[in-house]
């Protein structure tokens, strides 16, 4: 009997990228394999089965790939949370802190409606800054974030605690300690 692969088995680890001492978790190998990709989408959704979800929001950039697949599976709309200046219509924006400085993400000001229930999807939860900004944007439009789903959690960087402190449940398929 052939053992079933886990999502973790499809993720490649690249040492010293983008800097010395970093172990980069590369999910592109997960996306390249149809079995791995399907497994990841199914597992991202599993804790939210039975929940009302009106839209799926993906965080730039790999969250677009995963979030789009999740939205398709649910037959729901997809919302892009993008870096500032990339969306063509009227937007709202939210700044968040980086290690050195600040970044800004935005969504269209009509991306969700008041009362909508939104699931946020991304590949990786590290410090939680981008997820926090995405949650704030969606809530500013009057919608509710019912959860955040990630392929990978890096718990040592504190992102889960930051998102959960906002009252938003976090689901991650796998976790990696350290950097």
UniProtKB/Swiss-Prot annotation:
Species assigned in the record: Jannaschia sp. (strain CCS1)
Protein's name according to its UniProt entry: Adenine phosphoribosyltransferase
PROSITE patterns recorded: PUR_PYR_PR_TRANSFER
Listed InterPro entries: Ade_phspho_trans, PRibTrfase_dom, PRTase-like, UPRTase/APRTase
Family: Belongs to the purine/pyrimidine phosphoribosyltransferase family.
Keyword Cytoplasm in record: yes
Catalytic activity: AMP + diphosphate = 5-phospho-alpha-D-ribose 1-diphosphate + adenine
Location(s), subcellular: Cytoplasm
Main function: Catalyzes a salvage reaction resulting in the formation of AMP, that is energically less costly than de novo synthesis.
The protein's enzyme class: transferase
Lineage: Bacteria, Pseudomonadati, Pseudomonadota, Alphaproteobacteria, Rhodobacterales
Subunit structure: Homodimer.
One GO-annotated biological process of the protein: purine ribonucleoside salvage
């Amino acid at each position: 009997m052939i053992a079933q692969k886990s999502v973790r088995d499809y993720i490649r680890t690249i040492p010293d990228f983008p800097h010395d001492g970093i172990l980069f978790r590369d999910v592109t190998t997960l996306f390249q394999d149809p079995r791995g990709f399907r497994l990841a989408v199914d597992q991202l959704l599993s804790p939210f089965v039975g929940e009302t979800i009106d839209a799926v929001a993906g965080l730039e950039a790999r969250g677009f790939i995963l979030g789009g697949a999740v939205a398709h599976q649910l037959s729901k709309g997809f919302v892009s949370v993008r870096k500032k200046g990339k969306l063509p219509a009227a937007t709202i924006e939210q700044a968040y802190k980086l290690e050195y400085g600040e970044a800004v993400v935005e969504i269209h000001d009509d991306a969700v409606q008041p009362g909508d229930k939104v699931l946020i999807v991304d590949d990786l939860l590290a410090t939680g800054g981008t997820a926090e900004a995405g949650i704030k944007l969606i809530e500013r439009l009057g919608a509710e974030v019912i959860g955040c789903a990630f392929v990978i959690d890096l718990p040592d960087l504190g992102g889960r605690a930051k998102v959960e402190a906002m009252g938003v449940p976090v689901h991650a398929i796998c976790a990696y300690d350290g950097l």
